[in-house]
Amino acid sequence: MRRIDPNTLELEEKVVAINRVAKVVKGGRRFRFAALVVVGDKNGRVGFGMGKAQEVPEAIRKAVEDAKKNLIEVPIVGTTIPHEIVGRFGAGRVLLKPASEGTGVIAGGPVRAVLDLAGVGDILSKSLGSNNPINMVRATVKGLQELKRAEDVAKLRGKTVEELLG
């Protein structure tokens, strides 16, 4: 898999979750923040990243930097995905189903952020298992990563698309 250069893309970013973590010390509590950010060009490229810092803006900046390093390519057919798939990460499972045009993005919270920024216009999704935002985002990205176009599968098998689809 070749790396996608984030500098050549018009990337949008969306903060999915901010977590405040407290460390209790003698003088009281010390707070730190962890941010989960999704970036994408709404044209088949998306990535997510985590950032931790003493302040929220710094955590978000680090997360965006991390997300730009982890961009993936999403195969989009028309306005939807090529086939149904279940993305799994930890206890989080996300079911992604192609939908007919005009359906829109039917997805909750973190999954919706990933699909919107990937540029998927019509899709049905259901999150199963863990509803932790990090696990949901990772499961969604993993599912999108495993998608394959009919042409790619046909080429791998040395057949035509017509032979493959019957």
Swiss-Prot record:
Domain called S5 DRBM: residue spans: 11-74
**GO cellular component labels:** small ribosomal subunit
Write one Gene Ontology MF term. rRNA binding
Query: Which biological process terms from the Gene Ontology are attached to this UniProt entry?
Result: translation
Q: Which Pfam families did the record assign?
A: Ribosomal_S5, Ribosomal_S5_C
Q: Keyword rRNA-binding on this protein?
A: yes
Keywords tagged on the record: Ribonucleoprotein, Ribosomal protein, RNA-binding, rRNA-binding
Annotated InterPro entries = Ribosomal_Su5_D2-typ_SF, Ribosomal_uS5, Ribosomal_uS5_bac-type, Ribosomal_uS5_C, Ribosomal_uS5_N, Ribosomal_uS5_N_CS, Ribsml_uS5_D2-typ_fold_subgr
The answer to whether the entry has keyword Aminoacyl-tRNA synthetase is no
Q: Which residues form the signal peptide?
A: none
Q: Which NCBIfam families match?
A: rpsE_bact (TIGR01021)
Q: What does this protein do?
A: With S4 and S12 plays an important role in translational accuracy.
Family from the record: Belongs to the universal ribosomal protein uS5 family.
Domain comment in the entry: The N-terminal domain interacts with the head of the 30S subunit; the C-terminal domain interacts with the body and contacts protein S4. The interaction surface between S4 and S5 is involved in control of translational fidelity.
Assembly behavior: Part of the 30S ribosomal subunit. Contacts proteins S4 and S8.
Q: What is this protein called?
A: Small ribosomal subunit protein uS5
